[in-house]
């Protein structure tokens, strides 16, 4: 089901949040309890949903459809999707309703669908920035794709909000773009999340 977006202005970017019908949270479905099974009561972390196999760096793409296709492929190859074609269609339908280029060279496409098996993220940095019809008009070089199962209650919005919070910091985004390996990319995120948890 495509989501309808609303915008919340922040100091650096206009962050796209989806309404409550399009969010994923950790209550209710088995997917929602994926971290409870590990006895983990800490707040959700981006690194819980992102692994090196779903990070691609300095990718060369012609447009946002190619970037989304590449990220869907990573989700599919790592067993996160029931139907990659259906999920990609869902993401593109959501994109047609309003750009997920949130500003500052960042885009957060997303889709909630029964084509998704488990909540997951994929991420890419681009060798050359692409036009994304972003809210601030800036071309995009950093993308995160959020995948949510249809039955996952509000996880979608939680992940959007968490990503938006982290990506508001220009230096953080620059560190991600400069990462030379997927492991380094994830380490940048983990370091930032650990710093916030320690506050």
In which residue ranges do the predicted regions lie?
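Cationic, amphipathic, low-complexity segments that mediate targeting or membrane/lipid association
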Residues: 11-21
């Amino acid at each position: 089901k495509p989501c309808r977006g609303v915008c919340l202005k922040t100091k650096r970017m206009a962050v796209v949040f989806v309404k409550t019908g399009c969010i994923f949270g950790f209550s209710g479905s088995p997917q929602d309890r994926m971290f409870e099974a590990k006895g983990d009561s800490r707040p959700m972390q981006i690194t819980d949903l992102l692994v090196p196999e779903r990070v691609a760096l300095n990718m060369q793409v012609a447009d946002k459809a190619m970037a989304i296709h590449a990220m869907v492929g990573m989700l599919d190859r790592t067993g996160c999707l029931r139907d990659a074609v259906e999920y990609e269609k869902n993401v593109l339908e959501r994109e047609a309703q309003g750009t997920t280029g949130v500003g500052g060279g960042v885009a957060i496409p997303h889709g909630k669908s029964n084509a998704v098996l488990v909540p997951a993220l994929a991420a890419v940095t681009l060798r050359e920035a692409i036009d994304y019809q972003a809210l601030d008009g800036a071309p995009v070089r950093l993308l995160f794709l959020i995948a949510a199962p249809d039955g996952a209650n509000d996880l979608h919005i939680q992940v959007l909000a968490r990503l938006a919070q982290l990506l508001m910091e220009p230096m953080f985004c620059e560190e991600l773009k400069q990462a030379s390996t997927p492991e380094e990319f994830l380490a940048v995120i983990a370091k930032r999340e650990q710093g916030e948890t320690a506050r």
